[in-house]
Amino acid sequence: MGTAKCFIAANFFRRNFMVRERIPACTGAAGLLYYNKTRAHRQMPLPTEYCRKGVPDAPRPADTAMSKCILVINPGSTSTKIAVFRGAEKVFDETLRHSREELAPFHWVMEQVDFRRAVIERALAAHDFDTAQLDGICARGGQLPPCESGTYLVEQRMADYMYTIKHAAHASNLGCVLALELAQPLHIPAFICDPVSVDEMTEEARITGLPEIRRTMLGHALNCRAMARRCAEEVLHKPLEDCRLIVLHLGGGASARLFIGGKMVDGVRDDEWMFAPERFGGASLQPVVRLCYSGKYTEKEMTDFIRGKGGLVAYLGTADAREVEKRIADGDAQAKLIYDGMLYSAARAIGGLAAAADGQVDRVILTGGIAHSKYVAAYLTKKLSFIAPVEIMPGEFELEALAAGACRVLEGQERPKHFALPTAQA
């Protein structure tokens, strides 16, 4: 990495980890709910170590603000990504891949908890890493009810809630349970950061024309917010709260978020206005209703089209954008039509968010794995540059974002948030 980039990266993390407000000391009476495999609920007092490691009892000097050791966990459908950070520095990372044969015995994603925890423990042992060094664990957050952005302390009720999600349960639901089970014997706090269900949408944006259905957010909140924060710090050189940004994440799925005043005030879900390599979206409703009642497909099959078997998979038989671009380079006109159609649908969605921002947008940010493609960058830059300059920030920085979120809490820059059940379920 060049000197300039090193300086920018260091500056970014220094600003994000600086202590800004004191968080009161925790007390043993508060208690910490733990989860065990029998799911027999019990409350254990907060150990002294938790107060020492978990929540600072006094502001830290700025020169110690990057010393916390964090294990981060990002569970996906066929892999679990882990990394250990000491402040902003990544000590090591690894993608633990799970074969179809390994996952075959599990009929529901939450049945994989013991399997994935064992895989993580073996990987840490293989790196000869002493978990006693850890100050906290932060995992990708799952399908919680709509919530604010931020870093959440993982408590028993959050882990329990993941077990109530039976329909279309996502692998991210494993994150908080894995973090809590690994943190329990170490007496350190477990966190999640910017879960997929972050929803700060304005009320007028929720109206659909049918009272029974309100728009909600769902998508790549963690990476979108990380890229928005990074663009604000490194490109615009001002706080995220002072920026107006649109972030488009393009991966196996696609979603977009509009940031105003530091909040995600509107967005496009991965099942809404655009389609993606594995997602169906952007269709008129009447044909969808007719297909649902045609008798041709079950509810599960229709749901699979929305996430998993739609998009490029349905048209071209593959979700691999690199393969599709190779077909285009080889003269496959159908592949070009479908691929361009996917990018067109994304550009159209971004245009809608720009209108929601009154046309006042500082940057449009392209991120996710597909943003590595020069073809994609050129197509979308041409379509979107009339709105605002387009920043290409490819890849995913979810591991870094998880570590940064935990550090901001552990160093006293932010207060941890607490999960609350929806009123109807409390």
Predicted feature residues:
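Short glycine-rich, Thr/Ser-proximal phosphate-binding strand/loop in the N-terminal lobe
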Residues: 70-111, 270
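N-terminal phosphate-binding loop and adjacent alpha-helix
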Residues: 94-132, 156-158, 162-167
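Glycine-rich phosphate-binding loop plus the immediately following alpha-helix
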Residues: 174-181, 192, 207, 212-244, ...
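Conserved phosphate-binding/catalytic loops in two-lobed NTP-binding clefts
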Residues: 374, 378-404
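Glycine-rich phosphate-binding loops at beta-strand->alpha-helix junctions
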Residues: 361-380
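Structural signal for terminal/edge beta-strands and the immediately following C-terminal loop/tail
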Residues: 394-426
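Adenine-nucleotide phosphate-binding core of ATP-dependent small-molecule kinases
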Residues: 304-359
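Short beta-strand-loop/turn "lid" adjacent to the catalytic site in phosphate-handling enzymes
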Residues: 124-171, 189, 197-209
